[in-house]
């Protein structure tokens, strides 16, 4: 885990990931009964990600081996036993994940994950 050294009194704080747009995940599983099986995995993913300290794509792959690393700081995660795809944009320097897309494989095939 990376540590941020704060000059005031020499305190140190671990810098963990922040997830932006978690609401998008909740809206997805609430959007249709057929997506209700994604609720547990979509609650678990941010819980795991916020404990991480990803400062490189290699750290993402070390934690989530099935994740696909794309250009432009994008990563694709398999959700609910590979039934759904989650696309995030990761700012490794600031340790922020921006949720960009969640959908089925068919929906994922219709987007450009490096742009969405």
Regions found by a protein language model. Name each.
Residues 1-83, 91-96, 105-116:
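Basic, Lys/Arg-enriched alpha-helical interface segments
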């Amino acid at each position: 885990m990376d540590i941020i050294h704060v000059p005031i009194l020499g305190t140190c704080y671990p810098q963990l990931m922040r997830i932006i747009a978690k609401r998008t995940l909740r809206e997805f599983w609430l959007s249709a009964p057929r997506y209700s099986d994604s609720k547990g995995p979509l609650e678990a993913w941010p819980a795991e990600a916020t404990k991480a300290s990803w400062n490189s794509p290699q750290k993402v792959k070390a934690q989530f081996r099935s994740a696909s690393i794309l250009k432009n700081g994008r990563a694709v995660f398999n959700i609910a036993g590979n039934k759904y795809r989650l696309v995030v944009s990761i700012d490794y320097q600031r340790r922020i994940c921006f949720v960009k897309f969640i959908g089925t494989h068919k929906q994922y095939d219709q987007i450009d994950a490096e742009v969405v």
